[in-house]
Amino acid sequence: TAPTEIYTLSLHDALPISYSTELGQNRALFDAYQALAASPEAASFDVAQKTILEHALRDFRLSGIDLPAAEQQRYAEVQSKLSELGSRFSNQLLDATQAWSKHVTDETTLDGLPDSAKAQMAAAAAAKDLEGWLITLEFPSYYAVMTYASDRALREELYAAYCTRASDQGPNAGQFDNGPVMQQILDLRQELAELLGYKNYAELSLATKMAESSDQVLSFLRDLAKRSKPFAARDLAQLKAYAAEQGCPELASWDAGYFGEKLREQRYSVSQEALRAYFPIDKVLGGLFSIVQRLYGIEINELKQFDAWHPDVR
């Protein structure tokens, strides 16, 4: 993972919020789009062209083009602050992830883990001039422990550390706490929505989406939950029964991944680790790009020379 300061610079380069806001509030450009929409030429546009024009005009309005000057300025301030808070949230989560680690010197603690995972942990320890293995909250390390580690206490410890990152709970409680950041984001999003004439941020968000209202979204989700719950309950009951057979009468959150993998191996004689060999990154990307080309006629070629915040970026 890149150091936070490098990640921050990269993120700000990718999010030119002030430019986007100024562009969206450019009256001359908006008037030009309106004139085009009212022109005889626009009447002969095909569906795609008309949609692009409609969306452009919509986006101007969602940038506050119709607001009085003072409210336009406030809109710009809120957008800038939201960008800053979004970056701070990501950076604090990254810092919290990197702040926790567990140094292991007894290999039996890692019983059940694949050799590839242990090798990564050994490399992480060596990078810090430590003997043995270093477990971190980076996802490959976390996933390996939660899926394969036989040591239930280790899974619980890691689960608690991972799920409480950047919060007022857990082993690093209060450090890099994102709670206040989230509250500020919620408050500013509400203000932004009201500036643009919406009751709440959910309605503002839906202005650019297919769903017509937040009630429609909630209705869809509730219906999906109603249809899915019986199947999820069945799977959970089977997992609990299997865990009980293996000596775990009370299935906890940090047990689900471990016993789920064990049950999968028992039923299908295959493990996630074994499947990895068939899906190297280059093969996966090649397959994905091939599908895109067949479906949409788009050819994707890799750019070899470019500036990035980390050498692994492609």
Per-region residue spans from a language model:
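Extracytoplasmic mature domains of secreted/periplasmic and thylakoid-lumen proteins
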Residues: 16-52
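Acidic, low-complexity proline/glycine-rich segments
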Residues: 38-55, 136-157, 189-194
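Active-site-proximal, well-structured secondary-structure segments within enzyme catalytic domains
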Residues: 52-53, 81-84, 91, 95-136, ...
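Extended, charged alpha-helical coiled-coil/arm scaffolds that mediate oligomerization and mechanical coupling
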Residues: 54-87, 93
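A conserved hydrophobic secondary-structure block that centers on an alpha-helix together
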Residues: 64-78, 165-184, 191-204, 218
